[in-house]
Amino acid sequence: MSSGMHVALVTGGNKGIGLAIVRDLCRLFSGDVVLTARDVARGQAAVQQLQAEGLSPRFHQLDIDDLQSIRALRDFLRKEYGGLDVLVNNAGIAFKVADPTPFHIQAEVTMKTNFFGTRDVCTELLPLIKPQGRVVNVSSIMSVRALKSCSPELQQKFRSETITEEELVGLMNKFVEDTKKGVHQKEGWPSSAYGVTKIGVTVLSRIHARKLSEQRKGDRILLNACCPGWVRTDMAGPKATKSPEEGAETPVYLALLPPDAEGPHGQFVSEKRVEQW
């Protein structure tokens, strides 16, 4: 495998929106597409399913909660391709509405994967992104709703153009601590743990886009957060309005922005349109 070969990678690619994104990239992206999943058997089964459709993704194990797993993937990409052209951070979790797990545990578990896991992937893989690369962080419209339910003080912090990654990490940790103390509502947080983790993903995207513009100005890398919509998946359930294929549309659009595109960059995108944050 030569370092001249283009490569796209999708996290959480074995089912739902992730699998639909992999399928589209296999059809539309000129290069290799790597499907990653936490569970090797499920990931390989997804690859076989796509092979039966005449597509040929590669598989690599990735558990975004496990730093060693992330670093093994990083080393694989560096060795096989000399970097990465497209990264779609899709892996994430949500508790069902009726789940009896105590709220503070839901908050901690969801935050660990959706925010901190995604952040760890970015820390390890963003330095590998090649010039004209594309990074897509799958967030949610729930992040916009959760933001509107935050106190004005928190809203101001999350909308700040100068918030640092360290400050954001501090706020995400504070949310989890506040839920443990049972004071999260008094402290101005909304009642959706999932929504807060996705605020984290959207704001992290804004921070990373800003850093790329400052540190790699001429490389024309575009990084955005997006909402796939309300999609029929294991996570959202059967009543959702969109198919996984429809949910993949905006993430794939952002992953395949043409080389000469100036934007969007550092935006929250829904239905292929930039939404106000």
Curated annotation (Swiss-Prot):
<feature type="active site" description="Proton acceptor">
    <location>
        <position position="194"/>
    </location>
</feature>
<dbReference type="GO" id="GO:0005737">
    <property type="term" value="C:cytoplasm"/>
</dbReference>
<keyword id="KW-0007">Acetylation</keyword>
<dbReference type="InterPro" id="IPR045313">
    <property type="entry name" value="CBR1-like"/>
</dbReference>
<comment type="similarity">
    <text>Belongs to the short-chain dehydrogenases/reductases (SDR) family.</text>
</comment>
<feature type="binding site">
    <location>
        <begin position="10"/>
        <end position="34"/>
    </location>
    <ligand>
        <name>NADP(+)</name>
    </ligand>
</feature>
<dbReference type="GO" id="GO:0047020">
    <property type="term" value="F:15-hydroxyprostaglandin-D dehydrogenase (NADP+) activity"/>
</dbReference>
<keyword id="KW-0560">Oxidoreductase</keyword>
<feature type="binding site">
    <location>
        <begin position="231"/>
        <end position="233"/>
    </location>
    <ligand>
        <name>NADP(+)</name>
    </ligand>
</feature>
<dbReference type="GO" id="GO:0006805">
    <property type="term" value="P:xenobiotic metabolic process"/>
</dbReference>
<keyword id="KW-0963">Cytoplasm</keyword>
<dbReference type="InterPro" id="IPR002347">
    <property type="entry name" value="SDR_fam"/>
</dbReference>
<feature type="binding site">
    <location>
        <position position="140"/>
    </location>
    <ligand>
        <name>substrate</name>
    </ligand>
</feature>
<comment type="subunit">
    <text>Monomer.</text>
</comment>
<dbReference type="GO" id="GO:0160163">
    <property type="term" value="F:S-nitrosoglutathione reductase (NADPH) activity"/>
</dbReference>
<dbReference type="GO" id="GO:0047021">
    <property type="term" value="F:15-hydroxyprostaglandin dehydrogenase (NADP+) activity"/>
</dbReference>
<dbReference type="InterPro" id="IPR036291">
    <property type="entry name" value="NAD(P)-bd_dom_sf"/>
</dbReference>
<feature type="binding site">
    <location>
        <begin position="193"/>
        <end position="194"/>
    </location>
    <ligand>
        <name>glutathione</name>
    </ligand>
</feature>
<feature type="binding site">
    <location>
        <position position="90"/>
    </location>
    <ligand>
        <name>NADP(+)</name>
    </ligand>
</feature>
<feature type="modified residue" description="N6-1-carboxyethyl lysine">
    <location>
        <position position="239"/>
    </location>
</feature>
<dbReference type="GO" id="GO:0050221">
    <property type="term" value="F:prostaglandin E2 9-reductase activity"/>
</dbReference>
<feature type="modified residue" description="N-acetylserine">
    <location>
        <position position="2"/>
    </location>
</feature>
<keyword id="KW-0521">NADP</keyword>
<protein>
    <recommendedName>
        <fullName>Carbonyl reductase [NADPH] 1</fullName>
        <ecNumber>1.1.1.184</ecNumber>
        <ecNumber>1.1.1.196</ecNumber>
        <ecNumber>1.1.1.197</ecNumber>
        <ecNumber>1.1.1.71</ecNumber>
        <ecNumber>1.1.1.189</ecNumber>
    </recommendedName>
</protein>
<feature type="modified residue" description="Phosphoserine">
    <location>
        <position position="30"/>
    </location>
</feature>
<feature type="modified residue" description="Phosphoserine">
    <location>
        <position position="2"/>
    </location>
</feature>
<dbReference type="InterPro" id="IPR020904">
    <property type="entry name" value="Sc_DH/Rdtase_CS"/>
</dbReference>
<feature type="binding site">
    <location>
        <position position="106"/>
    </location>
    <ligand>
        <name>glutathione</name>
    </ligand>
</feature>
<feature type="binding site">
    <location>
        <begin position="63"/>
        <end position="64"/>
    </location>
    <ligand>
        <name>NADP(+)</name>
    </ligand>
</feature>
<dbReference type="Pfam" id="PF00106">
    <property type="entry name" value="adh_short"/>
</dbReference>
<dbReference type="GO" id="GO:0006629">
    <property type="term" value="P:lipid metabolic process"/>
</dbReference>
<dbReference type="GO" id="GO:0042373">
    <property type="term" value="P:vitamin K metabolic process"/>
</dbReference>
<feature type="binding site">
    <location>
        <begin position="95"/>
        <end position="97"/>
    </location>
    <ligand>
        <name>glutathione</name>
    </ligand>
</feature>
<feature type="binding site">
    <location>
        <begin position="194"/>
        <end position="198"/>
    </location>
    <ligand>
        <name>NADP(+)</name>
    </ligand>
</feature>
<dbReference type="GO" id="GO:0004090">
    <property type="term" value="F:carbonyl reductase (NADPH) activity"/>
</dbReference>
<keyword id="KW-0597">Phosphoprotein</keyword>
<comment type="function">
    <text>NADPH-dependent reductase with broad substrate specificity. Catalyzes the reduction of a wide variety of carbonyl compounds including quinones, prostaglandins, menadione, plus various xenobiotics. Catalyzes the reduction of the antitumor anthracyclines doxorubicin and daunorubicin to the cardiotoxic compounds doxorubicinol and daunorubicinol. Can convert prostaglandin E to prostaglandin F2-alpha. Can bind glutathione, which explains its higher affinity for glutathione-conjugated substrates. Catalyzes the reduction of S-nitrosoglutathione.</text>
</comment>
<keyword id="KW-0443">Lipid metabolism</keyword>
